């Protein structure tokens, strides 16, 4: 099988995870699951970035040791991913011993290339962004200096640090972007990066001496690595680096896809490839920067009190329901909005009505009238052949959308087919055909149910990456064995006469809790 290595960004565990984190994990998980079902050998890496001043300050404010806070909060992130059915192969933490070794080896390679030097740094630093800013990138607002880009407070910093010769990589980066147009996506982010790099790059401060929570610089333990050198290296660690002769590294590096938020595109599309070029390591194939998820159009924040807890949401509405909503509602790559009303509408309209009701009605008729066995169809009429052709052509379309990180379009294509299937079912009127004594009508009855069950089966196969548990239940109801669930099974028709289990509902309608009477 062809290897496929996909990663999420690693989150800062300085606070509790929110639905924005879940959005990235669910999207990346859907891609990983899709590739597995499409016969790829997938490695899926996620985790937490436990280093940096942000985590150290959060621990100091909480009055606990930094390592303890990082470990405790990382556990929360890992439990959230498990609760959302994220199928990662490794949950990395930047405090892991092998990650320290990987970070040090990357540093040594960049140093050996002559790209690291010691100098004094003075400038503005944002703890929240873990990033330096020059004067022109800041502004005074009510007596507080903030970054223009993110609106976060900055403090003046002066210390001796190591620098990376980022300025030497301007032309090499631009050449790579132009030679590899799919390296950065979507196009708006690619254009942003090219514009930024075209303006010329300054050398980058890559160590700190003002705190000690991080990976120590080789042979200079009074310095810790700038958090982004350490953090970005996690992608190499997850592939077995620094053992470049290992089977893991030779099989999975370079990464096929880094999935990140749009706010960290500069680190991934400018700094990271420059570090790798310096170290003589092949660059990842693609970086996709998704948009933000807002609450009713408003940015989520603790101060506003509108942060959505993804685990509580999944417990109330269902894990697969939340996964479907997040990937169906928002054009992936753009900013999107969450609301209670929108997710309930998707659950009741798309899942309960369009898919769940179609599966339930057709399978119930099979159970009641055909001894609970897959019907033996007659000759396909034009309407049957047209619907089957639409369903058969879905895999290629859906694959193209997933390869472009357009999961919303993949789901839209599947639901357009389900819309056609519901219209077909209504026009064919199997409930009327069932009552007829005509042999031709009975053949149409069996054929209609066969075609409906077959397109429901194909839909269930294709929604497995997004809704693995629910899709699995539908495939169970259709008598599909575990070895009949990869995408290779799309073209293998249901076998007439297959015994089916008693039908049960898969997607119940959501009814909001009613207040007690008299309230």
UniProtKB/Swiss-Prot annotation:
Q: Which residues form a coiled coil?
A: none
A GO biological process held by the record: methionyl-tRNA aminoacylation
Q: Which GO terms describe its molecular function?
A: ATP binding; methionine-tRNA ligase activity
Q: Which reaction is recorded as catalysed by this protein? A: tRNA(Met) + L-methionine + ATP = L-methionyl-tRNA(Met) + AMP + diphosphate
Enzyme Commission number(s): 6.1.1.10
Keyword Transcription annotated: no
Residues of the region (Disordered) are 500-519
Q: Where is this motif: 'KMSKS' region?
A: 299-303
Motif 'HIGH' region is found at 11-21
**Subcellular localization, as worded in the UniProt entry:** Cytoplasm
Q: Which UniProt keywords apply?
A: Aminoacyl-tRNA synthetase, ATP-binding, Cytoplasm, Ligase, Nucleotide-binding, Protein biosynthesis
Q: Which Gene3D superfamilies does this entry report, sorted A to Z?
A: 2.170.220.10, HUPs (3.40.50.620), Isoleucyl-tRNA Synthetase, Domain 1 (1.10.730.10)
* SUBUNIT field: Monomer.
Function of the protein: Is required not only for elongation of protein synthesis but also for the initiation of all mRNA translation through initiator tRNA(fMet) aminoacylation.
Protein family membership: Belongs to the class-I aminoacyl-tRNA synthetase family. MetG type 2B subfamily.
PANTHER family, from UniProt? Answer: METHIONINE--TRNA LIGASE, MITOCHONDRIAL, METHIONYL-TRNA SYNTHETASE
What is the protein named?
Methionine--tRNA ligase
């Amino acid at each position: 099988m062809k290897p496929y290595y996909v990663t999420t960004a690693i989150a800062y565990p300085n606070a509790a995870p929110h639905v924005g984190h879940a959005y990235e994990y669910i999207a990346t998980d859907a891609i990983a699951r899709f590739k597995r079902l499409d016969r790829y050998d997938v490695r899926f890496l996620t985790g937490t970035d436990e280093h940096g001043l942000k985590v150290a300050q959060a621990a100091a404010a909480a009055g606990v040791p930094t390592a303890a806070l990082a470990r405790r909060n990382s556990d929360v992130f890992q439990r959230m991913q498990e609760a959302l059915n994220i199928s990662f192969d490794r949950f990395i933490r930047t405090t892991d011993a092998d990650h320290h070794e990987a970070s040090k080896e990357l540093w040594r390679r960049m140093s050996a290339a002559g790209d690291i030097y010691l100098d004094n740094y003075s400038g503005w630093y944002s703890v929240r962004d873990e990033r330096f800013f020059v004067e022109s990138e800041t502004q005074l607002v009510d007596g507080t200096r903030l970054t223009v880009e993110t609106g976060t407070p900055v403090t003046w910093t002066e210390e001796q640090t190591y620098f990376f010769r980022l300025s030497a990589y301007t032309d090499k980066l631009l050449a790579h972007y132009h030679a590899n147009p799919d390296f950065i996506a979507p196009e708006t982010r690619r254009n942003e990066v090219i514009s930024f790099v075209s303006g010329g790059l300054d050398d980058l401060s890559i160590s700190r001496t003002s705190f000690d929570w991080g990976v120590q610089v080789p042979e200079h333990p009074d310095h810790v690595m700038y958090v982004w050198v350490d953090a970005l290296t996690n992608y190499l660690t997850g592939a077995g680096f620094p053992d470049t002769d290992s089977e893991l590294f030779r099989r999975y590096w370079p990464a096929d896809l880094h999935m990140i938020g749009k706010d960290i595109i500069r680190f991934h599309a400018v700094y990271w490839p420059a570090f790798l070029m310096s170290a003589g390591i092949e660059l990842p194939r693609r970086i996709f920067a998704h948009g933000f998820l807002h609450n009713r159009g408003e940015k989520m924040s603790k101060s506003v009190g509108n942060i959505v807890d993804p685990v509580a949401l999944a417990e109330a509405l269902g894990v697969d329901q939340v996964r479907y909503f997040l990937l169906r509602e928002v054009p992936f790559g753009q900013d999107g909005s969450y609301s209670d009303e929108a997710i309930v509408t998707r659950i009741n309209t798309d899942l309960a009505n369009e898919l769940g009701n179609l599966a339930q009605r057709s399978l119930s008729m099979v159970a009641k009238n055909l001894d609970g066995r897959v019907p033996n169809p007659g000759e396909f009429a034009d309407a049957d052949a047209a619907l089957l052709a639409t369903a058969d052509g879905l895999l290629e379309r859906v694959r193209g959308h997933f390869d472009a990180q357009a999961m919303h379009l993949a789901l839209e294509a599947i639901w357009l087919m389900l819309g056609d299937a519901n219209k077909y079912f209504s026009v064919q009127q199997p409930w009327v055909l069932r009552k007829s004594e005509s042999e031709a009508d009975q053949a149409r009855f069996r054929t209609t149910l066969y075609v409906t069950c077959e397109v429901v089966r194909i839909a269930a196969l294709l929604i497995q990456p997004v809704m693995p548990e629910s899709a699995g239940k539908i495939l169970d109801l259709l008598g599909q064995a575990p070895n009949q669930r990869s995408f290779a099974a799309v073209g293998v028709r249901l076998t007439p006469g297959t015994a089916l289990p008693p039908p049960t509902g898969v997607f119940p309608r959501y009814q909001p809790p009613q207040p007690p009477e008299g309230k």
